[in-house]
């Protein structure tokens, strides 16, 4: 998301080696690795490796049923060993990563809302990584800050934060998805 790229642009790599990583819900990560590689290099990092790692999809669980699994963990451990070997050897070539220039335009993200069962405990505001939920406005997240990570949904003790059933159904229909987000122009 743009927030991650904004924060990455504040870093100063000073030639330090780095590995760019895209964690995704076993669906698609589009231009993420390329964008991160570009931003990391601009910030002065030497990108020596890149990986896309599967994780549980934060909205549509069917995409990652049973993932990550033991094979995924084994693959990550082997990748880590190869990175260490590469760094130790001094053969620090820049990886070729998938993606498009110009980057594909991202669609609108899905913003979780609190329903009437919200107890106003404030945990969502405390734990939101992007500051999209204000302690003063718990039920109205700032759409410009929300990165659709679903942290608020996963930690709500009363399960009051949700994506609407309509949006969840639409997201499950891959024909309306563009770059991992819903393209409303494709919704009937």
Name what the model sees in each region.
Residues 114, 123-147, 151-168:
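Iron-sulfur cluster-binding cysteine motifs and their immediate structural context
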Residues 111-114, 161, 182, 186:
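Generic preference for hydrophobic/aromatic residues in regular secondary structure cores
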Residues 94-129:
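A mid-sequence, solvent-exposed acidic-amphipathic segment
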Residues 28-29, 117, 145:
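Charged, low-complexity surface patches
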Residues 1-107, 166-187:
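FMN-binding flavodoxin-like domain, especially the glycine-rich phosphate-binding loop
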Residues 116, 135-137, 143, 174, ...:
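Short linear motifs in intrinsically disordered/low-complexity regions
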């Amino acid at each position: 998301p743009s927030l991650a790229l904004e924060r990455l642009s504040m870093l100063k790599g000073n030639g330090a080696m780095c590995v760019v990583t895209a964690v995704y819900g076993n669906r698609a990560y589009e231009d993420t690795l390329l964008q991160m590689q570009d931003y990391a290099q601009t910030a002065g990092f030497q990108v020596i490796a890149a990986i896309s790692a599967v994780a549980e999809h934060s909205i549509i669980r069917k995409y990652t049923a049973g993932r990550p699994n033991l094979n995924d963990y084994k693959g990550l451990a082997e990748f880590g060993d190869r990175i260490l070997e590469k760094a130790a050897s001094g053969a620090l070539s820049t990886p070729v990563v998938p993606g498009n220039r110009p980057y594909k335009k991202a669609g609108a993200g899905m913003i979780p809302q609190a329903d009437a069962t919200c107890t106003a405990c404030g945990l969502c505001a405390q734990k939101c990584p992007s500051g999209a939920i204000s302690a003063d406005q718990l039920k109205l997240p700032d759409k410009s800050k929300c990165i659709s990570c679903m942290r608020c949904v996963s930690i709500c003790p009363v399960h009051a934060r949700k994506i609407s059933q309509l949006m969840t159904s639409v997201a499950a229909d891959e024909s309306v998805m563009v770059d991992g987000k819903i393209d409303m122009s494709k919704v009937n």
